[in-house]
């Protein structure tokens, strides 16, 4: 639960940082907002809901991959 939220939330932070330097800032911001909307349910207590949502969300999978690529 915490791992999924941590990875997804950090990925959104990284996306925020990149969007500031992106020529596609509007598109980036829209994607960030979609990611935040996806994350909201993960804040609620739940056994496997967060991990299941994380695995089933294409956005989260993509952002998790990007985050792992950023950090060595």
Swiss-Prot record:
Q: Which residues form the signal peptide?
A: 1-14
How is this protein named in the record?
U-scoloptoxin(04)-Er1f
> Single GO cellular component annotation?
extracellular region
Compartment list:
Secreted
What tissues harbor this protein?
Expressed by the venom gland.
Coiled coil ranges (UniProt) are none
Report the family membership.
Belongs to the scoloptoxin-04 family.
What keywords are assigned to this protein? Disulfide bond, Secreted, Signal, Toxin
Query: Which residues would be cut away as propeptide?
Result: 15-18
| Species for this entry | Ethmostigmus rubripes (Giant centipede)
Q: What is its main location?
A: secreted
Instruction: Reproduce the UniProt comment on modification after translation.
Output: Contains 2 disulfide bonds.
Which Gene Ontology molecular-function terms are recorded?
toxin activity
């Amino acid at each position: 639960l915490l791992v999924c939220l941590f990875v997804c939330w950090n990925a959104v932070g990284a996306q925020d940082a990149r969007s500031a330097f992106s020529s596609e800032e509007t598109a980036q911001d829209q994607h960030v907002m979609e990611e935040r909307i996806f994350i909201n349910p993960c804040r609620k207590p739940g056994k496997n809901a967060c991990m299941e949502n994380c695995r089933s969300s294409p956005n989260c999978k993509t952002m998790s991959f990007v985050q792992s690529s950023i950090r060595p």
